[in-house]
Amino acid sequence: MTVRAYDNQHPEIDESVWIDPSAVVIGKVTLGREVSVWPQVVIRGDVNTITVGSQTNIQDGAILHCTHDGPYSPGGKALTIGERVTIGHQACLHGCTIGQEVLIGIGATVLDGAVVEDQVMIGAGTLVPPGKTLESGYLYVGSPAKMARPLKDHEKEFLKYSALHYIRLANNHREVTG
C-alpha cells in the first residue's frame, strides 16, 4: 500500500483499518475504525480534507477526491463519508457529503456539493450532479439521479449487512496475507 503525506499533511489511519497493497492514500485523509480499502482505490486528500467514517468499505478501483479553494469554488469542498457506507467498485466521490448506512452502486458518481442523506441506495452507474440532495430512505437511479422508490425494510437491513460483511472479509484478508 502507498500511504503518503502531501504538503506536510499526513493521513490519519486507525490501527484497525485494512488497506490493500495496491491502494493509494494521500494527504489530509482520516480513516475511521474498521474501514477497508480494496485493490486499486485512490483516496487523494491533496487539496482538501477527506474523512471516512467507521466500518465503511471502499471497493476496488473507487476514487475519492475533494475540491480545492479557488475562484470557482470558494473554500473548496471536503469529502465526508459517514459510518457503515458501502462504496461500490469503480465509484467516484468528489467533494460531497455521504450520510450513514449508504450504498453507492458500482460505477456511480457523486459530484461536488451533493448531499446523500442516511439510508440511501444509489444504483450502479448513477450520476448525482453537483449540489443535489438525495433524501433518506430511497433508491436513486439514472443520470441525473432520480428517486425511484422507497427502500424496503430488507434493503435497509442489507445496508448494515454489507458493511459488516466487508469487515469480516477484510479481517480474513489480513489473516491470509499476514
PLM regions with names:
Residues 2-16, 20, 71-92, 136-178:
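C-terminal segments of enzyme domains that contribute to small-molecule binding surfaces
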Residues 15, 20-21, 26-27, 32-33, ...:
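Left-handed beta-helix
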